[in-house]
Amino acid sequence: MSDFIRGDRRVIVFSAHAADFCSRAGGTIARLIDAGSKVHIVDFSYGEKCESPALWARDPAPSLAEIKQIRAAEMDAAAAILGVTIECLDFGDSPLLIGPERRQQLLELFRRHQP
């Protein structure tokens, strides 16, 4: 096992959209969990605009709040399967902007989780 994938770590995985952590890093996250690390996922957005075209195509079209609810349920289910904790900062997407207030939120997140 490589030094990177070892137990007793506290890891934060940042994800732009709700499903990115699974499709981009799911295997690594699973290996970290299997090795005994604790992983917390931080999604910047629900991917409600650019990552949800199939949801927007439904008839009748769902509201933005409904799209976010669906995406939240999907990310919670994926997190439960992986055995991680998760939160969504709901920064919105398209564009996803990180200004001073949001940077402060991220600093607080690091202080809280101590990765």
Residue ranges and their predicted role:
Residues 1-113:
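Active-site rim/loop-helix segments in enzyme catalytic domains that contact anionic ligands
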